[in-house]
Structures are given as C-alpha cells and as structure tokens.
Amino acid sequence: MASEKPIVVVTCTAPVNIAVVKYWGKRDEELILPINSSLSVTLHQDQLKTTTTAAISRDFTEDRIWLNGREEDMGHPRLQACLREIRRLARKRRSDGHEDPLPLSLSYKVHVASENNFPTAAGLASSAAGYACLAYTLARVYGVDSDLSEVARRGSGSACRSLYGGFVEWQMGERPDGKDSVACQVAPESHWPELRVLILVVSAERKPMGSTAGMQTSVETSALLKFRAEALVPPRMAEMTRCIRERNFQAFGQLTMKDSNQFHATCLDTFPPISYLSDTSRRIIQLVHRFNAHHGQTKVAYTFDAGPNAVVFTLDDTVAEFVAAVRHSFPPESNGDKFLKGLPVEPVLLSDELKAVLGMDPVPGSIRYIIATQVGPGPQVLDDPGAHLLGPDGLPKPAA
C-alpha cells in the first residue's frame, strides 16, 4: 500500500495490575465511575504485559482492531469511547495552540493490533492492561500528553491503574463528570524490592459471568456492597497506603486477604449469588492460612479477582518454600518443568513438620502453572521497529 504521507506507527507495552483494595461497582455505567476508591500493585512486564501497535494513514478507509491475531468489532462501545476521548484531547491540544508533533489529520483512520502474553479473560486482568496500553499508544500517536486516566477508564475501570508502575490508587472522585476520578501513584516500583508475586493459574477458561455484568447485579442487589463502599473502604485505603509506605508485610498481607474475602462475600450477597472461586481456589486459601499458622506470622497473602486464579504476595525469602508447598499440595500432572514460569525459583525440600501442618490430600493437576513475578513499571514505548505488530501496509504481521 503506497502511502503519499509516511505512516505513523507507535508500539507500546502496558502492565497488569492486581487490586489489594478491590473495585467492584459503578455509580455511572457510561463514564465508568466507581462506587469506591481502590488500590493496586502493578506487576512486572517481563512476565505479564499487553503489547499494542497503533498506526494512522490517509490510506486507511476505516478504524480497525486485531486482538491476539483476530480482527474484532471496532464498533464496541468501550473501544469507541476510548478513541473518541483521545481524538477529543488531540483536537483540544491543537486548538489550545500547541504545535502538533505529528502533522497529521485527525480524520485519518487508525489500525490497532494488540496481544497479551497471558490468557485473555481468565481473571488475569487482561482488559486493564489492554485498555491502558490502547490509551497510552493512541496518546503517543496523536501527541496527547495530558492525564490518560479518563481515556483508559472509559475502556475498563481498572485500566487507569495500569497507567503507572509500583503501587497505584484509583481515587473514586466526587464530580458527576468524573474529572476527579483519576489514578495516581502511591509508591514507585523501586519502593519495596523484596516483594514478590505468584500467580496460581487454576483455569485459563473464560469465566461464567464477566465483571461488568457481575458488578452491575451486585450494585443493584447487595446491601453489603453498599455498606462496604461507604463505611469500610475509606479507612482501608488509608491503612493499606500506610502498610505499603512502611513496607509492613504482615499488615499488608492480612488486609489484602481480608479485602479479597470481603469482595467475594459481596458477590455471594448479590442476588442471584455470584461465585468466582472454585474448589481449588478455596484449597489455596486453606493452604495459605495453614502455611502462615505454621510460621506463626503472615508470610504469604492471597487475593482473588473475579475469577478462580490466586495472586499470592510474599517476600523474596519465602518464595521457594511456598512454591514447594504448592507443588506438594497441587502436584503438576505431567508438565513438571513447565509448572513454574517467570522469575527463577530455587527448589527446596519441605520440612516434615510443614507437610503435616498442610495435611491436605494432594490434588494433582488442579493448578495448571505458577507465574513468579514482582512489582514493575508503568507503560513503555518500544523504539525498535521490529517490535511493531502491524506491517508497512497497516495490517498485522504474519505470525513468526
């Protein structure tokens, strides 16, 4: 496709974030404004990331998007909301007299290709990374340098938290137009270098009820959710921020587990009830509490989003022993060498005392694999043209 003007192509990556004070429920469905503030940990992109390439050209006849190699409907309302918002900000920037770094017409159509290096829609916060990456990449294409919380949030609420590294707060805000519902960093990724994150992948299948439908039903039917948002979350946000600033793992871990349990309690309080946890999820919860009881302190902490996969926080000196405990209780059926992905973990032998305390009959194959990772940075621009997911013709490159 010979183009009269050079095509503008930008590729970026964005991280997954895991909430330790959960967001569940919107007060405005269209603007995606939450009923409570939330706080999350950004995971490292070496293990989990979305990569997005956006290109604009006068030769494109329509906006198009490909996710993990498959073309999707660009008419999806949330995709449209993101695009509209970015183009509005670009027009505003231009009308404010800023010099346009890329002399291009806002009427040009955009092609977007995006891929995750982890299962989509399996409770690994893929939409958060995806929409954060989309917002960040489109902003680079259109020369927008303002806060992108609103753009990302219009795609997926928790996406605004993936715009920053480290520890991130999404302030619920009070304004009806949502201008004060923004994400901000509580502490950078360098703040707590010993913190480690283990993702226990129970299922890579799509969940039975998506988050959007689930939280809408909860807002309509759960009195517990309303009480949580109004009375319990504000002091929890302050306490969680303090735990992080002081690097107090015991308090951080306990509050993380309590908040996860309370979130799932609001799901059960929803009518009809929603259950995102599986039998394996509940066994992991039991394993964590027995492991901590054996040590007489909180050394590991679980949290579950709207899905059965566990995210476990711990410190680097505990990772090896806890991974061994998981292997003992949930032995891999066959793929022993592929059971652990991500950061290397030295194998260790469990003490007989700990095995006795765990006291669970092993359930082979119920955990598919573990991803070992750590706290990481926010979105990144990839300067290497070889990283582009779109070819010179503006279409996805063939899979290597």
Curated annotation (Swiss-Prot):
Gene3D superfamilies: 3.30.230.10, GHMP kinase, C-terminal domain. Pathway: Steroid biosynthesis; cholesterol biosynthesis. GO terms for cellular component: cytosol. It is found in: Cytoplasm. (R)-5-diphosphomevalonate binds at Y23, W24, G25, K26, R78, S156, G157, S158, A159, C160, R161, T212. GO terms for biological process: cholesterol biosynthetic process; isopentenyl diphosphate biosynthetic process, mevalonate pathway; isoprenoid biosynthetic process; positive regulation of cell population proliferation. Keywords: Acetylation, ATP-binding, Cholesterol biosynthesis, Cholesterol metabolism, Cytoplasm, Lipid biosynthesis, Lipid metabolism, Lyase, Nucleotide-binding, Steroid biosynthesis, Steroid metabolism, Sterol biosynthesis, Sterol metabolism. Pfam families: MDD_C, MVD-like_N. It catalyses: (R)-5-diphosphomevalonate + ATP = isopentenyl diphosphate + ADP + phosphate + CO2. It is an enzyme of class 4 (lyase). InterPro entries: GHMP_kinase_C_sf, Mev_decarb, Mev_diP_decarb, MVD-like_N, Mvd1_C, Ribosomal_Su5_D2-typ_SF, Ribsml_uS5_D2-typ_fold_subgr. It comes from the Eukaryota. GO terms for molecular function: ATP binding; diphosphomevalonate decarboxylase activity; Hsp70 protein binding; protein homodimerization activity. The modification N-acetylalanine is found at A2. Its EC number is 4.1.1.33. Catalyzes the ATP dependent decarboxylation of (R)-5-diphosphomevalonate to form isopentenyl diphosphate (IPP). Functions in the mevalonate (MVA) pathway leading to isopentenyl diphosphate (IPP), a key precursor for the biosynthesis of isoprenoids and sterol synthesis. Belongs to the diphosphomevalonate decarboxylase family. This is Diphosphomevalonate decarboxylase.
